[in-house]
């Protein structure tokens, strides 16, 4: 039977989109849909065979003058009242379900969308993330799903929920890069600083502080950051948003960045030593991931509150003499295995 595979993509950062794109590419399915807010920013890289449903944001606008949080609802993370965007989203999503049946929905990520799909009789695959997700909304979303996918190895599991563990397929790690493409030997005096799109405590002040402590190192800053007009050390280059991130990273022996999933996996793919700064995220996601990979050679964590208390010169020097094993987080066939699991589920369902 013909069926549609749809991906709900959370708008925060770019990691959810990049993961969905990788899985969709591996699926090679003829009928696929991406749905989420602010997807138009990716219009130049979405394949032509994938339909895009750009949803309104679910936050109140100035015109939502009757907006209220309403009574507390334990089964959802976010369920405001009288927000037009929320009403429109629900209508657009359920209309998509109605017009594209049968459908399998891959949710990356939203408890509310997963539950809406189940209420509409649409089977789901829910992508798991690190973090303390033993709350009721997560438990209900996981129960409602036909399959849970963890884009990391089972050895990195931090949950103790037996039902969640039993339902989870562990793909191992992957990124948009390929191990086979990395042929450049790194230079010990080159360090990359990654600034993600989800918000970071790695500010210009922090970058200057680190560079001043490490005058023998040259720093490549990748990502959007507000650069003041004041002078900064000469051992810093601000590349901004660039298309040759992989090439720059591969020249660097060490990477400094936050602990978003995709950042960790990209560093792991090129197998560079990594100083991870866990940002304050819901459910302690990045801190949980840092603790999960703490045993990996070449990884060190610096808490945001300790940035200006850290001896960066010593930390960098210590890491540069270690042979990293960050690549142990990567499973070369991970994306293909996810595609196989999704297809197997769809064949059983439809």
Set out the residue ranges of the language-model regions.
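A donor-sugar binding/catalytic signature common to diverse glycosyltransferases
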Residues: 107-108, 245-288
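A short, glycine/small-residue-rich beta-strand->loop->alpha-helix junction that serves as a flexible
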Residues: 9-21, 200-202
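Conserved nucleotide-sugar phosphate-binding/catalytic loop shared by glycosyltransferases and other
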Residues: 10-11, 30-84
């Amino acid at each position: 039977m013909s069926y549609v595979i749809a991906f709900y993509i959370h708008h925060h950062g770019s990691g959810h989109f990049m993961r969905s794109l990788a899985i969709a590419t591996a699926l090679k399915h003829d009928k696929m849909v991406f749905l989420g807010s602010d997807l138009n920013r990716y219009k130049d890289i979405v394949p032509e065979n994938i339909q895009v449903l750009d949803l309104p944001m679910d936050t109140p606008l100035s015109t939502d003058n009757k907006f209220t949080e309403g009574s507390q609802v334990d089964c959802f993370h976010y369920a405001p009242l009288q927000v037009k965007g929320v009403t429109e989203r629900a209508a657009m999503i359920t209309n998509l379900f109605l017009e594209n049946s049968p459908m399998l929905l891959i949710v990356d990520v939203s408890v509310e969308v997963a539950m809406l799909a189940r209420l509409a009789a649409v089977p789901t695959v829910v992508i798991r993330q690190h973090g303390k997700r033993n709350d009721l909304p997560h438990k209900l979303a996981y129960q409602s799903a036909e399959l849970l996918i963890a884009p990391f190895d089972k050895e990195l599991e931090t949950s103790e929920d037996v039902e969640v563990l039993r339902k989870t397929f562990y793909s191992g790690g992957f990124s948009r890069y390929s191990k086979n493409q990395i042929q450049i030997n790194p230079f010990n005096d080159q360090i990359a600083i990654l600034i993600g799109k989800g918000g970071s405590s790695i500010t210009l002040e922090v970058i200057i502080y680190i560079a001043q402590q490490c005058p023998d190192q040259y720093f490549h800053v990748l990502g959007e950051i507000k650069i003041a007009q004041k002078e900064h050390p000469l051992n810093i280059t601000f590349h901004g948003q660039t298309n040759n991130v992989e090439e720059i990273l591969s020249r660097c022996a060490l990477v400094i960045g936050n602990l978003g999933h995709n950042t960790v996996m990209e560093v792991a793919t090129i197998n560079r030593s990594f100083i991870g700064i866990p940002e304050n995220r819901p459910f302690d996601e990045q801190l949980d991931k840092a603790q999960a990979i703490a045993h990996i050679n070449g990884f060190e964590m610096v808490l945001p509150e300790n940035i200006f208390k850290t001896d960066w010169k010593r930390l960098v020097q210590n890491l540069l003499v270690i042979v990293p094993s960050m690549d142990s987080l990567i499973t070369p066939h991970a994306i293909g295995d996810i595609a196989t699991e999704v297809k197997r589920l769809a064949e059983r369902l439809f």
